[in-house]
């Protein structure tokens, strides 16, 4: 099984619409791990990326580890 490069997915898709400031701003919308997963899924669907669930999960995990630090 091939590993998912979540950073590449973020670099190729997410930061094309916004920079990392949305993850670090004081008034960020995401306040839980479930909400983060939902936001990643919403962006994926809005951009019609057709990611698999494991890709959404990998990006959620990366963003949580790098920016949010929500408890699993």
UniProtKB/Swiss-Prot annotation:
GO MF, one example: metal ion binding
UniProt keywords, alphabetically: Heme, Iron, Metal-binding
Amino acids binding heme: 14, 17-18
Domain of life: Bacteria
Protein name: Green heme protein
Species this protein is from: Halochromatium salexigens
Organism lineage: Bacteria, Pseudomonadati, Pseudomonadota, Gammaproteobacteria, Chromatiales
């Amino acid at each position: 099984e091939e590993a998912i490069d979540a950073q590449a997915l973020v670099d190729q898709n997410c930061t094309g619409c916004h920079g990392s400031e949305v993850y670090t701003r004081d008034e960020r919308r995401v306040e839980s791990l479930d909400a983060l997963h939902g936001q990643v899924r919403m962006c994926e669907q809005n951009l019609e990326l057709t990611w698999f669930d494991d890709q959404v999960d990998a990006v959620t995990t990366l963003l949580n580890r790098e920016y949010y630090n929500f408890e699993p």
